[in-house]
Amino acid sequence: MTQAEIVKCLREEYEIEHNKDQKPEKEDLPAITKKFYQRVLELLTIHKVPYSKQEDEETYEEYLLSDTEESGNKKKKQQGKLKNQDSDDEDVEARIASIKNKLRQKKGPTTERQQKRRESKKLKRSKGVQKLLLSSAKNLKNENVKHQKLKNGVVKSEQETEDSKEQIQPVKVQPVYNQEAKIVYSKVDFAANPGGKAKKSHQNPKEILKKLRDTKKHLTELREQGETDKAAEIQTDIAWRNAFDKVEGKKVKDDTKLLQKAIKKRRVEKKKSKTKWTERKQKVEHDKEKRQKKRQENLEKRSKDKKNRKLKTASKRGRIIPGY
């Protein structure tokens, strides 16, 4: 049974029990209403009518018969409109869902292969990946060029070594004999440490020049005295020593002109550094004095401001101070 039928039945029963023509007295109204409510409750419980969820005025009116046909028609129209709106909303939602599905089908790749292709294209389009690809390509190119150069260099070096080996001939050492016809063994071994580090020569050119001058003076004195053999022997010793130094990799500094040049250069550099140092010292002292002066001025200013403030406060309180 519908709600309208239930209400109709209630109305008929009410009309049967209470005649329409008879008007109830004022005293019997509360008792009649009580009985009517009890009857309605019994009917509702018998027919198992559910409670309405919406507690609006329209829902209560649905259980009652309409007084006029117009109001009933209006309600029906409103219900029809609501139903139509619901159906329209459902149709719109269904259409939106179908469009979304179509778009997904278009966008989404059908196979894994297509998906991988799209991902690779996206990666290629991105700027960061393009930069990486370019840099990697350049690195590969550089590595290939280096590899080829190394190969060419190795081949050339091998050829050069082979040529040098062919050119090198074994040195035949001939024994040296003295006056007594005995073999003299050299005390100097030239190939003792061919790959060793070169020893550093004396660095101070002033001392080297002084030493050279002293030796020259000594040689001239010997020649003047008539000891030419001794002078020649000393000269040969010096020549041999220089030769051995050159073999060991030392720098032989026996040119007086170059030594004088080096001394002059050192003197100029020393002078330059001295002037720079004095300028730096003066600048440091000047900056120091400037900072101290500024600090002193700030301290004096602060003390003056403090005094002025105190004098002002005193004058405001009523003390007579000259100048305020």
Swiss-Prot record:
GO molecular function: DNA binding; nucleic acid binding; RNA binding
GO CC aspect terms: nucleolus
Location relative to the cell: Nucleus, Nucleolus
Region named Disordered: 53-167, 264-324
Gene Ontology biological-process entries: ribosomal large subunit biogenesis; ribosomal small subunit biogenesis; ribosome biogenesis; ventral cord development
Regions of compositional bias (Basic residues) in chain numbering: 115-128, 264-275, 304-324
InterPro entries: Rrp14/SURF6_C (IPR029190), SURF6 (IPR007019)
Keywords attached to this entry: Nucleus, Phosphoprotein
Modification sites for Phosphoserine: S87
Biased composition (Basic and acidic residues): 157-166, 276-303
Function: Involved in a nucleolar function.
Family to which this protein belongs: Belongs to the SURF6 family.
Protein name: Surfeit locus protein 6 homolog
